[in-house]
């Protein structure tokens, strides 16, 4: 088997996400939270494994020659599927047993007759790379936002567009997005990814309170808090996006707001479409030359 640290970066990323999943699911089961475990597994399989890893690696799977790159892709996918079968066995016992036996009997990699006889997976800390996970999440978020804007304007992905602008909140975010800019360009079919200082003023942020989260948390103080949120400056909005929380003073009390407590959007610029999610804003140039 090819060592994980000798496989391509995208293989190392999905293995890192897999081991993060193992830790989370183990904790959910220990807390008697099977619903949270199921959601975590579902998100991993749909968003990370299927929509991202398998799709980006499809040319590696299709290769005619059985070289190391193709072997690494198959070994990585196999590890993910067998591990998912083991993680899901307590909540989907029959299907996961079938999946496990189909995978292991064909390869002879494990001697257990059933997934329910196999050991529950253990997280390997050396395989977890949080910086790589964060970097790839930026690529996923930007790509998802741009593709949603294309869909909104009914501009097909095969139609190249000139550029996408992304305001960055700090040097770390700039470095992470720069590292995956080629991947973003290939995914959304744009020629340029332009990173802006978030304080440049090109994009004007708007903010409004999220009453669904504020109401249960703050009750009668919600009115004062929502009024304060609506008066936030651009600097306060940027700090909230950068730090994922912001402390404000309401009637002599310190209140900590999170990104879940607000809805942040950006004003559209003529000839551009703007969207944001997870603290990332994109502006897509929709001019077709």
Locate predicted features.
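Feature 926 captures the class I aminoacyl-tRNA synthetase adenylation module centered on the KMSKS loop
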Residues: 1-289
